[in-house]
């Protein structure tokens, strides 16, 4: 699981 939602891109 990524530390951000799958609906947004990482910084």
From Swiss-Prot:
Gene Ontology biological-process annotations: regulation of blood pressure
Alphabetical UniProt keywords: Hypotensive agent, Metalloenzyme inhibitor, Metalloprotease inhibitor, Protease inhibitor, Pyrrolidone carboxylic acid, Secreted
Main location (coarse class): secreted
Top-rank lineage group of the source organism: Eukaryota
Listed GO MF terms: peptidase inhibitor activity
Tissue localization of expression: Expressed by the venom gland.
Residues annotated with Pyrrolidone carboxylic acid modification: 1
Transmembrane segments: none
GO cellular component, one term: extracellular region
Subcellular compartments: Secreted
Family the entry assigns: Belongs to the bradykinin-potentiating peptide family.
Function text: This peptide potentiates the effects of bradykinin on smooth muscle, and inhibits the angiotensin-converting enzyme (ACE) in vitro.
Name of the protein described by the UniProt record: Bradykinin-potentiating peptide S
UniProt source species: Lycosa erythrognatha (Wolf spider)
């Amino acid at each position: 699981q990524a530390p951000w939602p799958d609906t947004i891109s990482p910084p």
